[in-house]
């Protein structure tokens, strides 16, 4: 039985102009947050509206008082935290949040290649992105993002942290398809999102209750693309300003 090589064909396509943050994908958000108090790595335990302001209790029992509250979290988490204060039209939405598993790797001594991303027709590997193509930095190290298919992620999302086979299989698929040598990989890290995105969208772009001043914006309102999050946030901002 002879060996049958795998082939894939590259095709360059012209597309609309794209914009990305120079330092990172969240560079624009960080710019607009300058001068505003921020708190990170703080999990919200519960929220309460006392008819005057919001009381936001963190898991360390710290209470933050705020005139308004805006959620950007996945739909299942939103319902747990804010069910008491949301309109039924939001609570009754049929939102199917889908998972993904992503592995980041660094490849030493890699020459620059004219590729930004590759999509695969595979049951496990959905696509890979060549991060160096964004021209944010100069490096002899090739940085790649490897993302699984939704179907496979649904099977593995609850075990990827404790089972190294999940990460190893994603990397193995990447190596087989690209020809990059395993011994060239000097860094690898895998992360999963159980509620990554909603590919079907919803009838709404955002939600704002001007009486209680609770708002919701998220990509799952609109679709699975990165810009869906911005479009939802922009729509919420317009609603807040309209009813200010």
Tell what function each PLM region has:
Residues 134-140, 187-216, 220-222:
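FAD-binding beta-loop-beta segment adjacent to the flavin cofactor pocket
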Residues 63-116, 180:
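Central helical "cap/lid" subdomain
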Residues 1-6:
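N-terminal FAD cofactor-binding segment of flavoenzymes
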Residues 208, 213, 218-242:
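A conserved FAD-binding loop/helix module that cradles the flavin
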Residues 9-31, 159-169:
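Short beta-strand to alpha-helix junction loop
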